[in-house]
Amino acid sequence: MIVNVIGAGLAGSEVAYNLGKRGIRVRLFEMRPKKMTEVHKTGYFAELVCSNSLKSEDITNAEGLLKAEMRLMGSITLEAAEKARVPSGKALAVDRNIFAKEVTEVIERLESVEIIREEVTEFDPEEGIWVVATGPATSDGLLPFLKKLLGDDLLFFFDAVSPIVTFESIDMECAFWGDRFGKGKDYINCPLTKEEYEEFWKALVEAEVIEMEDFDRKLLFERCQPIEEIARSGKDALRYGPLRPTGLVDPRTGKEPYAVVQLRREDKEGRFYSLVGFQTRLKWSEQKRVLRKIPCLRNAEIVRYGVMHRNVYINSPKLLDIFFRLKKHPNIFFAGQITGVEGYMESAASGIYVAYNVHRILKGLSPLKLPEETMMGALFSYIIEKVEGDLKPMYANFGLLPPLKVRVKDKFEKRKKLAERAIETMKKFLEENPW
């Protein structure tokens, strides 16, 4: 059977490579350079359109642990990155052109991979195996078909998310639980006095923002106004908008605070909370500085920064099973950022995971879920099984992993032990369930 892969980004390239090198026949569709996207510059596979950094290789960093697991499973992304590496301290940074050229040439040399430089605008869902790995820049030609396949309400244009912090880093001596007018206790509320609010407002309006390309601007601002833009419209704008205290009584004072920052739970276990109404395009360093002006968040650990950009992704918890297959069409897989993983390595890792299970299915075996003690397994489980409400894209972070059985106070030592457990778990899994 032929496996059809749409899109030769990081995820699609991993699928084609990991199947192709094992003799599985693959048709890899890539419309570039015949039809370019708004963000790509070349026709190479796995082109890095933003940063040239693939982040840390240190296993006590979540991105480093993710790479260690990917190397165990086999990754064209990391093999090519070694050949394109440029000096960057503990981080893995690459020469973009050398990197993308290497990925392209390796896949072109695989005899079982047929490369088709055409745009796919539709396909027969009942015929063969399909892997949709079209990324955040999915073509306008394919979108109508995907909407028809998935349903209009299940294909999102992702243009804004708020920062997400860990629950354990919120100062609950300062914050209080509650919903407006006493209608529940679903939200964490961070009260601000007049002086604290004005200090926060001043820091927000003076903070540096990320400049967006022209192609993004119309899409973003007609859909969702960043919190810093609301703040610039007037000193009290936030108090009558996302920070309004109406109906929220601080149990310590018996009164409504001057302003309130609300946090909403992001996962079933209650480990992550997002800041309500804090969609932003502030630089990441500025987000950290400004959020720490909020007393209850002075020590907040941000596991996902707020971002605003044009993106397309699907509501994976409703549409996909844990193997990234469409529930109503199990022969159609999705991989990469379109599934709701965020980041270069996360996207590539999802491609490896999909390739692994497609390979098992073609061998007549059942697909397998990766252990949740691994970073890959925890990330994919979060995306598919643990999100409450609508999915917001997530990247690798240690907060996703199940806690250690023994409490470790030192943060570095805790991450080291979590990483060691993850690597040993992945090694054992692959020994018992090889490709």
From Swiss-Prot:
The gene is trmFO. Belongs to the MnmG family. TrmFO subfamily. FAD binds at G7, A8, G9, L10, A11, G12. The keyword Cell division does not apply. Its cofactor is FAD. SUPFAM superfamilies: FAD/NAD(P)-binding domain (SSF51905). This is Methylenetetrahydrofolate--tRNA-(uracil-5-)-methyltransferase TrmFO. Its EC number is 2.1.1.74. One of its GO terms (biological process) is tRNA methylation.
